[in-house]
Each structure stands twice: as C-alpha cells, then as structure tokens.
C-alpha cells in the first residue's frame, strides 16, 4: 500500500517539476534534503519524535530550506510533514527517479563485477542492452568481490547472472543431488 502512496506523491511532485521545467533541480534538491535528514541525527530525531508538534517540525524545515529550494518543493515537504510521511522521503525520491527514467524512455541497469568495467566494455554492454530493450540504458556499476568473476546484470525484473559464483553454486547443487 505504501509503495502506491509513494508513487502518487512522487508523480504529483514530478508533474509540478515538469511544468516548471525543474525536474533535475527537484531531483538534486531531494537527494540533498535526504542526505541532510538522514545524515543529521538531531534533525532526524526532531522529525521522528511524536511529541514535537507538526507546527514546530514545519518551522524547522522552513528555517533550513526556505529560500534555498523552490517554493513548490518546500510546500511538498510541508504536506509530507502534515501527513506524517516526511521520514519516507527517500521512497518518494526513488519513485520520482523511476518516473523520470520512464518519461525519458530509459531503463536502469545495475551491473556487478569484481573489477570496474573498461570504457569499451561499458559501451558494448550498454549497446547490447539498448538493442535488447529498445530503450536508453543508464548503467550503474558496483564492485562485488563475492561474485568471484563474470558479470551480474539486473534491468528491472530481468537478471542476467554470468558470475563464477552462480556457476559454482549450480555445480554444488548438481553434485549434492547425485549423492
């Protein structure tokens, strides 16, 4: 249920940002706001504390963000405080990023490897994925030594697991079945 609400909030904010031609600005501001909220224990505790009034929480946010972010974005934060959803701002940001990718005909491909891919490998992988999905691909690389070797690629719900670890796990299962 909450994912649906997160999506609705994110879509509403995205449409405002799109109307104002400030989508990138809103996304960047939301990322920074999340860093401030989740990176500052004192602020986080104020927001989280049930005995601190909504009025005081809103005042705190106005003091921090007024004049630094767009008024519509600040209003959005005020609504989240009123609805007691401000602690779930990260989820709204994630949904807004998904909407942004969808609207730009782009998919996020998460790639795990033991060593960073070379520019040539990235280019070839992106080309292959763009051909397969007929969409632009945004590649996010992660180094994961536990996979031993090969690549692990996730695009949406699709997984391409060409890791040495998965092959070894498969061989182990086959050998255990034979016993």
UniProtKB/Swiss-Prot annotation:
It comes from the Bacteria. It is a peripheral membrane protein. It is found in: Cell membrane. GO terms for molecular function: proton-transporting ATP synthase activity, rotational mechanism. Its main location: membrane. Keywords: ATP synthesis, Cell membrane, CF(1), Hydrogen ion transport, Ion transport, Membrane, Transport. InterPro entries: ATP_synth_OSCP/delta_N_sf (IPR026015), ATPase_OSCP/d_CS (IPR020781), ATPase_OSCP/dsu (IPR000711). Coiled coil: none annotated. SUPFAM superfamilies: N-terminal domain of the delta subunit of the F1F0-ATP synthase. GO terms for cellular component: plasma membrane; proton-transporting ATP synthase complex. Pfam families: OSCP. F(1)F(0) ATP synthase produces ATP from ADP in the presence of a proton or sodium gradient. F-type ATPases consist of two structural domains, F(1) containing the extramembraneous catalytic core and F(0) containing the membrane proton channel, linked together by a central stalk and a peripheral stalk. During catalysis, ATP synthesis in the catalytic domain of F(1) is coupled via a rotary mechanism of the central stalk subunits to proton translocation. This protein is part of the stalk that links CF(0) to CF(1). It either transmits conformational changes from CF(0) to CF(1) or is implicated in proton conduction. NCBIfam families: ATP_synt_delta, PRK05758.2-4. HAMAP family: ATP_synth_delta_bact. F-type ATPases have 2 components, F(1) - the catalytic core - and F(0) - the membrane proton channel. F(1) has five subunits: alpha(3), beta(3), gamma(1), delta(1), epsilon(1). F(0) has three main subunits: a(1), b(2) and c(10-14). The alpha and beta chains form an alternating ring which encloses part of the gamma chain. F(1) is attached to F(0) by a central stalk formed by the gamma and epsilon chains, while a peripheral stalk is formed by the delta and b chains. Belongs to the ATPase delta chain family. This is ATP synthase subunit delta. It comes from Clostridium perfringens (strain SM101 / Type A). The lineage of its organism: Bacteria, Bacillati, Bacillota, Clostridia, Eubacteriales.
């Amino acid at each position: 249920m909450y994912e649906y609400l997160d999506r609705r909030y994110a879509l509403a904010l995205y449409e405002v940002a799109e109307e104002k031609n400030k989508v990138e600005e809103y996304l960047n501001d939301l990322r920074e706001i999340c860093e401030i909220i989740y990176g500052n224990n004192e602020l986080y505790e104020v927001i989280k504390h049930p005995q601190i009034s909504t009025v005081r929480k809103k005042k705190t946010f106005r003091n921090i963000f007024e004049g630094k972010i767009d008024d519509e974005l600040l209003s959005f934060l005020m609504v989240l405080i009123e609805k007691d959803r401000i602690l779930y701002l990260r989820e709204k940001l994630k949904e807004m990023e998904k909407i942004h990718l969808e609207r730009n005909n782009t998919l996020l491909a998460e790639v795990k490897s033991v060593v960073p891919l070379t520019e040539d490998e990235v280019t070839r992988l992106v080309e292959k994925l763009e051909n397969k999905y007929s969409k632009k691909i945004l590649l996010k690389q992660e180094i994961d030594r536990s996979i031993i070797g090969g690549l692990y690629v996730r695009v949406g719900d699709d997984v391409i697991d060409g890791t040495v670890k998965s092959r070894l796990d498969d061989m182990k299962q086959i050998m255990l079945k034979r016993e």
